[in-house]
Swiss-Prot record:
This is Holo-[acyl-carrier-protein] synthase. Its main location: cytoplasm. HAMAP family: AcpS. Gene3D superfamilies: 4'-phosphopantetheinyl transferase domain. It comes from the Bacteria. Its cofactor is Mg(2+).
Length: 126
């Protein structure tokens, strides 16, 4: 296995909160997949939930080397937790097509947050 990409992102949670205060749920609609949206709607800390998802998706886009453009969208990267609570990534649409084209066989996700920040790293392996 070879490392195909590595991406890291850090998000200031207060910035996400400010955007939600100004524009309502538009950011969440743009960033979250349908499954994530269902969780966000009833989450006890929706701003923190969104900030963490945003960080993972930005890190993933960086790992792919593309950023969010050329057909890639935030909601094509879905963050979920396995049975032990470990964050994982599921890809849809153009993100899945790109992963297949690059030969991505494994995606590793780490996610951390504290009072003011959420941070994520994504590693893509062949």
């Amino acid at each position: 296995m070879a490392i195909l990409g590595l991406g890291t992102d850090i998000v200031e949670i207060a910035r996400i909160e400010a955007v939600i205060s100004r524009s309502g749920e538009r950011l969440a609609r743009r960033v979250l997949s349908d499954n994530e949206w269902a969780i966000w709607e009833s989450h006890q800390q929706p701003v923190r939930f969104l900030a963490k998802r945003f960080a993972v998706k930005e890190a993933a886009a960086k790992a792919f080397g593309t950023g969010i453009r050329n057909g890639l969208a935030f909601n094509q990267f879905e963050v979920f937790n396995d049975e032990l609570g470990k964050p994982r990534l599921r890809l849809w649409g153009e993100a899945l097509t790109l992963a297949e084209k690059l030969g991505v066989a494994h995606m590793h996700v780490t996610l951390a947050d504290e009072r003011h920040y959420a941070c994520a790293t994504v590693i893509l392996e062949s």
